[in-house]
Regions:
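Active-site pocket-lining segment
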Residues: 171, 207, 215, 286-357
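N-terminal extracellular/periplasmic Venus flytrap/periplasmic-binding protein-like
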Residues: 14-15, 25-26, 30-35, 46, ...
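Conserved active-site "lid/cap" helical segment
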Residues: 2-78, 85, 172-181, 191, ...
Length: 404
C-alpha cells in the first residue's frame, strides 16, 4: 500500500473580485480563469510546467463561456502545455475549495505529484438558458437565469425538499437558530470594517493579480482592487434596509453576500515535487471533509463538515488560529460559529472581512478562502487554519491547513 504523503500549497493568487456588471463584466469567464494560472506561471519562470499532473478548477455555473470543462480551456489560454490535463469540479459554492481538496487528496494518495487548483465564476456573464420543447410546436418553453439558484426544477425535489431561494434558506437558518436582525447587521458591519481596514493598508495586494480588462466605450482598464466592499457602511444604514426574501424577515442586501466575478488559483505539490521544481512550501493541506444537511437550511452545512474534519484530524475548534468561513449570509455565518462554539466577534474569524464585504463569486470563493487563510497564517504567525463554507441544496465543506 502506498504511504500517504504530505501535500503543500506553494503559492496562491487571485483576481480582484468584481461587482455584478462591474469592472470584470467584459472579461470572458474562461479568460478570467486563465489569469491567476498565468500569474503563477510568471511568478515561477524556472518551473517545468509540462510536469503538471493536473489542473483542477471549481465552477458552479458551466452554462456559458465556462462550458465544456473550463479548467482545460483556462490552462490552454494560460499557456500551460497542451499535454497537461484539466478537470472542472462542481459542488456549487464550495467548488473552488473542493478543487483544492480533490487535488490534494490525489497527491496525498500518490496518484499525482504536482497540480494547480482553484476556481472561477463570472456571475455577470451567466447566460439565460432555455429548455428544448418536448413536443412539436410547443409554446411552453422554460427560460432560466443561471446567475444564481434553482433552474429546471425537478417536481419530486420540490415536493420532498422544497426549492427555497438562497435568501429564504438564510431566513430559515435565522429562524431555526434564533439569529436576530440586529446580530446579523452587526456581523455584516464587522465584515465591512475589517475589509475596509485591510484594503486601506494594502493587505490584499499580496494575493491579488491586476486584471487588464476591456472597459467598454471607455477603453481598457486596470483592475487591481476588490469592487464590492463598502467601507463607509454604518449600523444605522444597515438597519434601514428592507428584507427582500420575506416580510417580516431579516435578510437584506446589507447582511448577505454579493453576486460577483473572480478567479483564484494555488500551486499544490508533494515534498519531492516542490523540491524538484524549486518551490517553497507555505502551508500543508491536512484534509478536507464534506457533509450534508436539509436543503432548506443549507447554511448550517459547515457545522457537520467541520466536526467531521476535526474528528478525523484529532482537532478541536480552539486549535485553529485562523478561521475563514464564507459569509453567504450573516445569519448562517453566526449560526455556524455559535454551533461550533466560536464568539460572534472573534478576532481570528474572517479578520480581513468575508463575503458580505468582499463578495461571493460562487466557484472562486472556496479557493479565495484557502489562499486568504494561507496569507493570514503567515501574517499572524499562526499554525492552523480552517476554511469552511455552506453549499446550496444542503451541504458543507471544510478544509484544514497548517503553516510550514
Amino acid at each position: 500500500m502506498t504511504e500517504l504523503r504530505d501535500v503543500f500549497i506553494c503559492d496562491a493568487v487571485r483576481t480582484p473580485i468584481g461587482r455584478y456588471g462591474g469592472a470584470l463584466a467584459h472579461v470572458r469567464t474562461d479568460d478570467l480563469a486563465a489569469i491567476p494560472i498565468k500569474a503563477l506561471v510568471a511568478r515561477h519562470p524556472d518551473v517545468d510546467w509540462s510536469a503538471l499532473d493536473e489542473v483542477v478548477l471549481g465552477c458552479a455555473n458551466q452554462a456559458g463561456e465556462d462550458n465544456r470543462n473550463v479548467a482545460r480551456m483556462a490552462l490552454l489560454l494560460a499557456g500551460i502545455p497542451e499535454s497537461v490535463p484539466g478537470i472542472t469540479v462542481n459542488r456549487l459554492c464550495a467548488s473552488g475549495l473542493n478543487a483544492i481538496g480533490d487535488a490534494a487528496r490525489a497527491i496525498r494518495c500518490g496518484e499525482i505529484d504536482f497540480a494547480i487548483a482553484g476556481g472561477v465564476e463570472s456571475m455577470t456573464r451567466a447566460p439565460f438558458v432555455m429548455a428544448k420543447a418536448q413536443e412539436a410546436f410547443s409554446r411552453s418553453a422554460e427560460i432560466g437565469d443561471t446567475t444564481l439558484g434553482w433552474r429546471f426544477i425537478n417536481p419530486v425535489i420540490k415536493a420532498q425538499y422544497g426549492v427555497d431561494s438562497m435568501a429564504e434558506t438564510g431566513e430559515n437558518v435565522a429562524q431555526e437558530y434564533q439569529v436576530s436582525r440586529a446580530d446579523q447587521d452587526a456581523f455584516a458591519l464587522r465584515s465591512q470594517e475589517r475589509a475596509g481596514k485591510a484594503m486601506a493598508s494594502g493587505y490584499f495586494a499580496q494575493e491579488i493579480v491586476p486584471v487588464e480588462a476591456p472597459g467598454g466605450k471607455a477603453g481598457p482598464i486596470t483592475v487591481d482592487k476588490d469592487e464590492h466592499p463598502r467601507p463607509q457602511t454604518t449600523l444605522a444604514g444597515l438597519a434601514k434596509l428592507k428584507p427582500f426574501a420575506r416580510n417580516p424577515g431579516t435578510i437584506t442586501a446589507g447582511n448577505a453576500s454579493g453576486i460577483n466575478d473572480g478567479a483564484a488559483a494555488v500551486i499544490l505539490a508533494s515534498a519531492s515535487a516542490a523540491e524538484r521544481h524549486g518551490l517553497t512550501p507555505r502551508a500543508r493541506v491536512l484534509g478536507m471533509a464534506s457533509a450534508a444537511v436539509p436543503p432548506r437550511v443549507m447554511g448550517i452545512g459547515p457545522v457537520p463538515s467541520t466536526r467531521k474534519l476535526m474528528e478525523r484530524l484529532g482537532l478541536k475548534i480552539g486549535d485553529f488560529d485562523l478561521i475563514e468561513i464564507n459569509e453567504a449570509f450573516a445569519s448562517q455565518g453566526l449560526a455556524c460559529l455559535r454551533q461550533l462554539g466560536v464568539r460572534d466577534d472573534a478576532e481570528h474569524v474572517n479578520p480581513h472581512g468575508g463575503a458580505i464585504a468582499l463578495g461571493h463569486p460562487l466557484g472562486m470563493s472556496g479557493a479565495r478562502l484557502a489562499l486568504t487563510a494561507v496569507h493570514g497564517l503567515e501574517e499572524r504567525g499562526g499554525k492552523l487554519a480552517l476554511a469552511t463554507m455552506c453549499v446550496g441544496v444542503g451541504q458543507g465543506v471544510s478544509l484544514a491547513m497548517e503553516r510550514v
